[in-house]
Amino acid sequence: LYKDLEKKVDHSAGLRLNGALSIAQNKERWQELLRQATTAQLYDVDVRVLNKDQIKKDYPIINTDEILGGIFMPGDGAADPSGVTYMLAKAAKKEGAQIFEKSPVDEILTKQGKITGVKVNGQEIECEYIVLASGMWSRQIGEKAGISIPLYPAEHFYIITEPIENLSKTLPVIRDFDNRTYFKEDAGKLLVGIFEGNSIPAFNKTNKVPEDFSFGEFPENFEHFEPYLK
């Protein structure tokens, strides 16, 4: 999709197909990854099963002492969020879509139990269908129409190292599910993130996502992050 759109609208999404490597450190996880690989191959997805020796050879940055193996998906990748957003917007406009920026939804209009439109910046816009694609704000917007959406954001932590000499720009995204961590190359540095089991609910004082938090950040909490670096 992204490659086709890049050509269609002549704008780069910053797409890099470095692949993704998922590793296993116990038998249960290894069996799970093997099942995933088998299922993916049934749908003609390119998945390669690697033993620990292959992982050590191809990705010496990984300590393989406790690794049983992994699966590599060369078709996975990452893109620049701003590039993707602009590319999708440009493609949508070419197909006749209109985009209104800085236009928060004041109200979802309904009649006889059916959604009929939205009120934006004081202006009512009639529509046959509404697609709610507002991420972590979806729950609050759904409430305006009496809809309960079971969605709530959690704080997400990551760190970025200092520049690492000879760090490969083609390093895949490495996922270590057993340690709830992931790693990827980021402009010559290594980004390390976590998806912890006991995550911290965001905005737990008000239980509401601020309208102006699009580019906001949470305070540092290294005590919460540090156990995953051991």
Where are these regions (language model features)?
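Active-site lid/adjacent beta-loop-alpha segment flanking the redox-cofactor pocket in flavoenzymes
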Residues: P163-K230
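A general structural signal for well-ordered alpha-helical segments in protein cores
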Residues: Y2, W30-L33, K52, V84-T85, ...
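Residue-level detector of anion-binding/catalytic polar loops
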Residues: D46, Q98, S148
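Helical element adjacent to the flavin cofactor pocket in flavoenzyme catalytic cores
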Residues: G70-Y129, A133, W137
